Amino acid sequence: MKKLLLTSFALLGAAFALHAQEDLTAAQEGVEELVNEKAEEKEMKTGWSFGILPTATFSVDNGFQAGAFGDVYYYGDGSTYPDPLHKISWEASYFTKSQRQRYYLAYDSKYLIPGMRINASLTYVRDPLYSFWGFNGPAAYDSGLSTSFTSVVYPVWSNRGTTPNINYFGMSRNMFRALANVQGRMAEHLNWAAGINFWNWDLADMRDPAVDANGDGTKTNYDHNVTLFKKYQELGLIKAGEEKGGMSVEVNAGLVYDTRDIEAAPNRGIWAEAYLNGAPYSGNPSTGFNSPYLKACVYFRHYLDIPIHIPAGDPVFAYRLAWQQTIAGETPFYMIQNIPLLVQRNMISEGFGSSGTIRGLRENRILAEGMAWANTELRIKLVNFKLFNQYFYLAVNPFFDAGIITKPYRSDVLDKVATNGKLYDTRLISSDIDWSKSETQLAPGYDGLIYDSSKINEIIMSSGIGLKIAMNQNFIISAEFAKCFNETLDGGLWIGIGINYQF
C-alpha cells in the first residue's frame, strides 16, 4: 500500500512537472512570437497620403519656378504598399526666365480595372520664350568662337538689356496634350500596352513683353527677325504649313516586361518596353499640311541590388538603354522634340537633353529622327527615419549619361542649303548690329557658322550627382547637378530639381 501511494505521488509529481514545463514553454514561445512580430514589423501605409511642395526651383533654361506640385496616394488597407491603389499627380507653376506656365493633372492605377493598368493625363504648357537650338544637336552649333559656347553665346544672345537686343534662339509655343494608356496581362510579368495621345501646338515668334531695356523710357522687344526660327523658315528647313504648329493624333501599341519590386524606386528587377508609336494624322487643318509618321521605341531598364547590408538599405545600380527612331514618314517640326512613353512619369517627356534623357544638356538641345542613349547611376541610401508618422529616406545617385544620333533630321534639305556641309547666318556679323555695347562680345573673325554636318555623329557624354528625399517610398524629391563633356553642347552647370528618379 505504501509503495502504491509513493508510486501515485511520483506519477502525480511527474505530471505536474510536465504540465508546468508545458506552460513555461508556451509562455516562452509567446514571448518569442511577440518579439519576432516586433522584429518583423515593417512599413505600412493605409488610406490616403498627400505630398505637396512649393515649386521653388531653378533651371538654366527657365529660371526660377514658382507654384506648387504634388502627389495624392490611396493605399486602401495597405496590402499593396508601397505601391498605391490609386495615384494622382498635379502641378501648376510659372518660370521667371522663360515665362513658361505649366499645368498638369495625371492619374495612374493598376487596380481600377482588375488585370489592367490605366494611365491618363492632361497637360497645358505656355512657352512665350521657348528656345530652339536647331537640328541634329552637335552639328547645330560650332565652337569657332573666341571662348567657350557657354560664355559667349548664352550671355549675348539670351540677355535682355544689352545691345544688340537679340535672343537668337527664341520663339514661342503653346502645347495642349491629352493622353490615355492601358496595359493588360498576357503572362507573368508580361503585359500588352496600347494608348492614344492628342496634341495641339501653336508656334510663333517670341511673345516677349516690351521693356525699357536701356533705361531711357523707350520700350523695345527682341528683334524677331534675327532668330534661328526665322532663318530655318527662310531656308525651308521648317516647312511652309508647319511653322505655325498643328495637331497630332498618335496611337501606340507594344509589349511591357516588368519584374520590379517597387515602381517608384526599384531595388531589383527589369522594366522593358518595345512598341510602335505613330500618327495617322499630324498636320495643320488651316494650311492643309499633313505629315504622318511611325516610330519604333525600345527601352530596357535594369535594377541590381548590391547586397552589402548597410543599415539604410542596400545600394542599387540602375541603368537604362533606350532607342527611338522614325521608321516611316517624317515627323513634323512641332513634334520632333517629343519622346513617346507608355507610362508618363513626368509632366513633359521631350528632347535629347535635360532631365529626361541626357542630363547636363540644355532643354531639347538635340532634335533628330533617331536617337540612342544610356543612363547609369548608383543609388545609395544614406539614412532612413520616421517623422510625423511618415517614412523617409535620404539618398544620393552619382550618374553618367551618353548618347548618339542614329538618324538625322532633314539632313537632305540641310545638304542642299549648306556649303560643304556648313551653314552660316551672316546677320550675326552684320555691320548693322553694334556688338560693341554688349556685355560679352563675339570673337573677332567669327563667321556666323550655325551648322556643321561633320559633328552629327559625335558621341554626347555627361556626368553628375543627384540628391533624393523620399516619403513613403513613392513621393521622391529630386535635385541633380551635371556637366556635359562636349564643348559645343556645354551649357555650364546643369541643375534639375523636380520629383522622381529619372527612370
Q: Where are each of the predicted segments found?
A:
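Surface-exposed extracellular loop regions of Gram-negative outer-membrane beta-barrel proteins
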Residues: 68-90, 250-302, 464-479
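Flexible, surface-exposed loop regions and adjacent strand-edge segments
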Residues: 135-143, 208-219, 289-291, 295, ...
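Short loop/turn motifs that connect adjacent beta-strands in outer-membrane beta-barrel proteins
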Residues: 22, 37-49, 76-86, 112-118, ...
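Predominantly the C-terminal beta-signal and adjacent terminal strand-loop region
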Residues: 321, 468-503
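Gram-negative/organellar outer-membrane beta-barrel architecture
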Residues: 43-50, 57-247, 252, 485-502
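Membrane-embedded beta-strand positions of outer-membrane beta-barrel proteins
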Residues: 52-54, 88-92, 118-122, 192-194, ...
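C-terminal outer-membrane beta-barrel translocator/porin domains of Gram-negative envelope proteins
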Residues: 262-388, 406-408, 415, 425-436
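Transmembrane beta-strands of outer-membrane beta-barrel pores
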Residues: 58-60, 72-74, 92-98, 111, ...
